[in-house]
């Protein structure tokens, strides 16, 4: 197909719609987990530096990501523990966000520490070497 001024915008819209359809699911793989780890480390640093704006953005990202992870594992068999870990970690990210929004960085730090432990606990069960 030759792209012209008329067909190019149509092709872009079709590509965007296809991308949106595929993005509904989440591929829980090493790249996603490394991204989560990076965001959690950034959140920990942002909370320690009392950077409310950056910390809130990281916490929101983790809340959204763990909702997707929970949904992903909820569709699989024999992953009830993974669903529980994802749900608990999502709640901890939400607690951190609430504390950040209240400028309670001590409570946010506690929530982030618990979040990190929750990640490690899940990895002890599910992470493959």
Outline where the language-model segments fall.
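Bacterial N-terminal signal peptides that target proteins for export
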Residues: 1-10
């Amino acid at each position: 197909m030759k792209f012209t001024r008329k067909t190019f915008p149509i092709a872009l819209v079709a590509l965007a719609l296809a991308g949106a359809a595929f993005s509904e699911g989440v591929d829980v793989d090493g790249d996603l987990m490394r991204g989560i780890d990076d965001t959690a480390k950034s959140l920990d640093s942002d909370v320690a530096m009392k950077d409310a704006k950056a910390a809130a953005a990281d916490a929101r990202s983790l809340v959204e990501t763990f909702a997707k992870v929970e949904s992903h594992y909820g569709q699989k068999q024999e992953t009830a523990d993974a669903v529980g870990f994802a749900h608990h970690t999502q709640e901890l990210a939400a607690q951190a966000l609430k504390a950040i929004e209240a400028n309670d960085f001590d409570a946010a730090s506690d929530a982030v520490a618990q979040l990190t432990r929750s990640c490690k606990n899940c990895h002890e069960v599910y992470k493959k070497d």
